[in-house]
Structure formats: C-alpha cells, structure tokens
C-alpha cells in the first residue's frame, strides 16, 4: 500500500501514540544487556513522535473540507475523526502529563507539566486560528475530566475512552456545523 495523498498521511497519524508507547517501554525498561545506542534511539524516537504532534495536525488541518462526502466516504471520515481524537487523548491527556510529572516531587513541577501538556495541545491546533485558545481551554477541561475519571475508576484506559468519546463527538459537531 503506497501513501499517495495527504489524507493517507493523516490516516497514519493515530499510529504515533502506539509507536511512542513501544519506544517508551524500551526506553523506560531497559534490558540488562541492551546497547546504549538502542536506548538513545528509543529516547530520540520518543521525543520525535511528541514533536511530530506539532507538525501533523497542521498538515491535516490544511486538507480540503470533506463535505459533501464522495459516495461511501462518510464512514471512513468519521473513523479517522475518532482515531485522531484517540491519538490526541492518549498523547496529550495520558502520556505527556504523566511522563512530565512522573518524577516531579513538588506541586510547582507537577503544575508545570500539566500546563506544558495543555500548551502543546493548543499548539497542535494552531492552524485553527483563533480557535487555538478554545482548543487550549478544551484541552485543560479534558485533562481535568481524565484525572477525575482515572481517580474514580482507577483505570487509565477508561479515562482515555471517556475523553476520546467527548473529543470525537465535539470534533464531529464542529465539523458538521462549519460545513453548513
């Protein structure tokens, strides 16, 4: 399967958190006899994926409007919409804040990690223009929802699923409203 269009590249964007998670496992849980070069490669890969979140959304926002859908394309669009929401939730609500705050001992350090993850989420939405501020506020609200649900249920997966559903529904509503 060849990648031929901008849409194909954007469809690959949701794979970033999966690859990020795999490289992080290698980086955080090094095997005893693994060469240091592999650990360095895992760390570079991890940070490259995090930084790519600031590039790929810009590229995806520049795609032409999907409306009206070509025949049979509506379902694929909404699947992509869901997968993009899932990848952003895993990355910006679970991975980045918890990675930044993992060794933080002070409230100030934890707050800086939380604020940085919200800023990165807003920056990833900068092609939306003035809606970037709204995206930052929504990112903060989704992080609060994530933390509360994780505390209530004890499950990071359940918290991610809830935030993904809210995020995907909002994106679907916003895109449909903009198309009118």
Curated annotation (Swiss-Prot):
The chain crosses the membrane at residues 37-59, 128-147. It is a multi-pass membrane protein. GO terms for molecular function: endopeptidase activity. Keywords: Cell membrane, Membrane, Transmembrane, Transmembrane helix. InterPro entries: Rce1/LyrA-like_dom. It is found in: Cell membrane. One of its GO terms (biological process) is CAAX-box protein maturation. GO terms for cellular component: plasma membrane. It comes from the Bacteria. The keyword Cell membrane applies. Its main location: membrane. This is Uncharacterized protein TP_0335.
């Amino acid at each position: 399967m060849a990648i031929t269009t901008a849409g194909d590249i954007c469809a690959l964007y949701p794979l970033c958190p999966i690859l990020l998670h795999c490289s992080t496992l290698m980086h955080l849980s090094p095997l005893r006899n693994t060469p240091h070069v592999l650990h360095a490669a895992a760390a570079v890969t991890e940070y490259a994926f995090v930084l790519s979140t600031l590039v790929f959304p810009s590229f995806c926002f520049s795609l032409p409007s999907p409306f009206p859908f070509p025949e049979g394309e509506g379902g694929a669009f909404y699947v992509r919409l869901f997968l993009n929401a899932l990848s952003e939730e895993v990355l910006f609500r679970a991975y980045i804040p918890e990675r930044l705050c993992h060794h933080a001992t002070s409230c100030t350090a934890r707050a800086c990690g939380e604020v940085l993850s919200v800023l990165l989420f807003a920056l990833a939405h900068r092609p939306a223009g003035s809606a970037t501020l709204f995206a930052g506020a929504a990112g903060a609200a989704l992080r609060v929802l994530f933390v509360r649900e994780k505390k209530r249920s004890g499950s990071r997966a359940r918290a991610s699923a809830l935030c993904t559903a809210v995020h995907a529904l909002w994106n679907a509503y916003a895109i449909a409203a903009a198309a009118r």
